[in-house]
Amino acid sequence: MSPEEELQSNVSVASSSPTSNCISRNTLGGLKEHNYLGLSDCSSVGSSTLSPLAEDDKATISLKATELTLGLPGSQSPARDTELNLLSPAKLDEKPFFPLLPSKDEICSSSQKNNASGNKRGFSDTMDQFAEAKSSVYTEKNWMFPEAAATQSVTKKDVPQNIPKGQSSTTNNSSSPPAAKAQIVGWPPVRSYRKNTLATTCKNSDEVDGRPGSGALFVKVSMDGAPYLRKVDLRSYTNYGELSSALEKMFTTFTLGQCGSNGAAGKDMLSETKLKDLLNGKDYVLTYEDKDGDWMLVGDVPWEMFIDVCKKLKIMKGCDAIGLAAAPRAMEKSKMRA
């Protein structure tokens, strides 16, 4: 062989010998890491010396850290263990996302920045100044309502403490009026509410000289030939004369028309006295219906009894009122009721 061929064979043997040694070692003792990138030996040694238990712990830690749980964004779930958290607040000095009151360092830094730059205040700056302005009276509970807290503190100081229990209860009852009844809104309860209010107002208005008076007593009044009806309150009158004058005013137009059509003296010649005569008995008679349903002549009983008995009033023609009860019969009937 020539000298050049011998040199090439030696180089090939030398280059193949370490690979063969590595392969033999790997096959005998298992796969091993080699520092191909030229890193430090300590990293390779540390990584090679890691036990399978540590690798299992790492896997469990990563699974716990990435597990989905319920909670607000930025907050750490209470179910997690603090030892398993990859980013602990103690190590990283974490701060809450929305603090109630800012720290003093942030206040100083923000005020210096605004003074240096000359910009307008932001929301955070206004909140910082509000936190600075709060006094020692305010606490975490009442910082949102400082006025109420201040008034409470003042009232607590002013109220005397040495007051007997009986006196305090009596003063409270005398000073505070009873609670008013809540008004009913809506339909149909409005109807009942109005009835109740009207009843109370009527009771208050009817009470005179400490005596509870009775309510209004409305009675229908009709007239033969009249196309309309009227209602009168009998309790608003005190005698028969007032009632007759009121009925004259109610039915004046109808009686005037009747008299003019019958050929009586004209409207100009008809006076109040003639109209009273018409109502008192010449052409028309005033009658009433009692509780038994009998029609009687008005004026046969005393006024108080008439108010209690009367149910309806009717102005009849004289010819139609001939068979009605006379005064003696009405008096006998009233005595029997008494």
From Swiss-Prot:
PB1 domain boundaries: 216-318
According to its UniProt record, in which tissues is this protein expressed? Highly expressed in the whole plant.
| MF (Gene Ontology) | DNA-binding transcription factor activity; transcription cis-regulatory region binding
Region listing for Disordered, in residue ranges: 1-25, 150-186
Q: Which SUPFAM superfamilies match?
A: CAD & PB1 domains
Q: Does the keyword Membrane apply?
A: no
Stretches of Low complexity bias are at 9-21, 168-180
Q: Which UniProt keywords apply?
A: Auxin signaling pathway, Nucleus, Phosphoprotein, Repressor, Transcription, Transcription regulation
The induction field says: By auxin.
Q: Name one GO biological process term.
A: response to auxin
Pfam families, per this entry?
A: AUX_IAA (PF02309)
Q: What family is reported?
A: Belongs to the Aux/IAA family.
Record remark: domains = The N-terminal half of the protein contains two conserved domains I and II. Domain I includes a slightly degenerated ERF-associated amphiphilic repression (EAR) motif which seems to be involved in the activity of transcriptional repression. Domain II is required for the correct degradation of the protein through the SCF-mediated ubiquitin-proteasome pathway. Interactions between Aux/IAA proteins and auxin response factors (ARFs) occur through their C-terminal dimerization domains III and IV.
- Assembly with partners or alone: Homodimers and heterodimers. Interacts with TPL.
Q: What does this protein do?
A: Aux/IAA proteins are short-lived transcriptional factors that function as repressors of early auxin response genes at low auxin concentrations. Repression is thought to result from the interaction with auxin response factors (ARFs), proteins that bind to the auxin-responsive promoter element (AuxRE). Formation of heterodimers with ARF proteins may alter their ability to modulate early auxin response genes expression.
Q: What is this protein called?
A: Auxin-responsive protein IAA9
Which species is this record about? Arabidopsis thaliana
Q: Quick one: which gene encodes this?
A: IAA9
